[in-house]
Amino acid sequence: MPALSCRFYQHKFPEVDDVVMVNVRSIAEMGAYVSLLEYNNIEGMILLSELSRRRIRSINKLIRIGRNECVVVIRVDKDKGYIDLSKRRVSPEEALKCEDKFTKSKTVYSILRHVAEVLEYTKDEQLESLYQRTAWVFDEKYKKPGYGAYDAFKHAVSDPDVLDGLDLNEDERRVLIDNINRRLTPQAVKIRADIEVACYGYEGIDAVKDALRAGLSCSTENMPIKINLIAPPRYVMTTTTLERTEGLSVLNQAMSVIKERIEEKRGVFNVQMEPKVVTDTDETELARQLERLEKENAEVDGDDDAEEMEAKTED
C-alpha cells in the first residue's frame, strides 16, 4: 500500500506572518532550503540574512540539516510556489506556540492517516477528502486551524456525538472513533521525587514522621501521595494522575510542606531528584531496590512505621 500524505490545513499555502514548522533539507550560498512539514513538505527558503539578528560566524551553529525549526513566513508567491521564511524574526513565545500547534496537528494527521490505511485508501485525494469531511470542518467551525480538530477529537473521547454532523459513512465513523480513543484517551502517569529527610535532634524519627505526614496531607482524592523509605534518610515520593502538570505541582507542594516542617524541628531536607514522570523501567528498578532493602532490613525492628506511609483518613 502506498504511503499516503496530505497537508495539515485546508489552505495549500501559509499566509504571510504565519509561524510554521520546517525541516532543513540543505544549505546553499543563498540560504537554507526547507520543507514545510504542515503543508505536505512544499519547499521554502530561509535567506542567510534571516537566520540571525547577530553577525553570522558559523551557519552550522544556527541551523543544521535534518533539524526542525520554527520560522515565520515573510513572502509567498503562490503562482511560482516561492515561500521565503525567517528564523530571526520568531520570538521564543511564538516558537512555543508553533511547536504546540504542530504537535497537535501532527496527532490529528496520524489519526486520519491511520483511518485511511485501515479503510484501505490508495490515493492521497482520498485522505484529503477525509480531512475535508472531518478535521477541516472543525478547524473552520472554531476558526482555529490545527487546534479546532484536535480539541474536537479530544472531546469525542468522552462524547462521540461531537462527530454526528460529519459526512461519514458507518465504517468511516467507527474506525475514526476507534483511532481517536486509541490515541487521545488520557493515560495515567506516575510522578516520582526522591528526598532526604532527617533530624538528629531530640525528636529524631518522630520529627521525620511528623514532617512526612504533613506532606501526605497534600494528597487529593484524584492524586494520592505515597512515601516509601529507600534507606535512611532517603525517601521516594510518588503519585499517579491523569494530569501531568497538576501531579508535578502537588508533589512540589508536598515537598515544600515537608521541608518547612522538618526545618522547624532543626532537621535536614534535601532534594535528591526533582519530581518527574517515571517510566515502567524506572518503576521496575525502584521495586527491585525496595525489595532488596526490605530483605536487608527484615530483622531490624523499630522502622516499620517509616517504611511506607500512605495518605489515610484518621478514624
From Swiss-Prot:
Comp. bias (Acidic residues): 299-308
GO biological process: cellular response to amino acid starvation; cellular response to UV; negative regulation of translational initiation in response to stress; PERK-mediated unfolded protein response; response to endoplasmic reticulum stress
Keywords: Cytoplasm, Initiation factor, Phosphoprotein, Protein biosynthesis, RNA-binding, Translation regulation
Family named by the database record: Belongs to the eIF-2-alpha family.
SUPFAM superfamilies: eIF-2-alpha, C-terminal domain (SSF110993), eIF2alpha middle domain-like (SSF116742), Nucleic acid-binding proteins (SSF50249)
Residue(s) carrying Phosphoserine: S49, S52
Free-text description of this protein's post-translational modifications in UniProt: Phosphorylation at Ser-49 and Ser-52 stabilizes the eIF-2/GDP/eIF2B complex and prevents GDP/GTP exchange reaction, thus impairing the recycling of eIF-2 between successive rounds of initiation and leading to global inhibition of translation, while concomitantly initiating the preferential translation of integrated stress response (ISR)-specific mRNAs.
Assembly notes: Eukaryotic translation initiation factor 2 eIF2 is a heterotrimeric complex composed of an alpha, a beta and a gamma subunit.
Protein activity control: Activity is regulated by phosphorylation at Ser-49 and Ser-52, which stabilizes the eIF-2/GDP/eIF2B complex and prevents the eIF2B-mediated exchange of GDP for GTP, thereby preventing the formation of the 43S pre-initiation complex (PIC). This results in the global attenuation of 5' cap-dependent protein synthesis and concomitant translation of ISR-specific mRNAs that contain a short upstream open reading frame (uORF) in their 5' UTR.
Free-text function comment from the UniProt entry: Functions in the early steps of protein synthesis by forming a ternary complex with GTP and initiator tRNA. This complex binds to a 40S ribosomal subunit, followed by mRNA binding to form a 43S pre-initiation complex. Junction of the 60S ribosomal subunit to form the 80S initiation complex is preceded by hydrolysis of the GTP bound to eIF-2 and release of an eIF-2-GDP binary complex. In order for eIF-2 to recycle and catalyze another round of initiation, the GDP bound to eIF-2 must exchange with GTP by way of a reaction catalyzed by eIF2B.
PANTHER family: EUKARYOTIC TRANSLATION INITIATION FACTOR 2 SUBUNIT 1 (PTHR10602:SF8)
PROSITE patterns: S1
GO cellular component: cytoplasm; cytoplasmic stress granule; cytosol; eukaryotic translation initiation factor 2 complex
InterPro entries to which the protein is assigned, alphabetical: NA-bd_OB-fold (IPR012340), S1_domain (IPR003029), S1_IF2_alpha (IPR044126), TIF2_asu_C (IPR024055), TIF2_asu_middle_sf (IPR024054), TIF_2_asu (IPR011488)
This protein's encoding gene: eif2s1
Localization annotation: Cytoplasm, Stress granule; Cytoplasm, Cytosol
Keyword field contains Protein biosynthesis: yes
Protein name in UniProt: Eukaryotic translation initiation factor 2 subunit 1
Region (Disordered): 292-315
GO molecular function: RNA binding; translation initiation factor activity
Ranges for domain S1 motif: 17-88
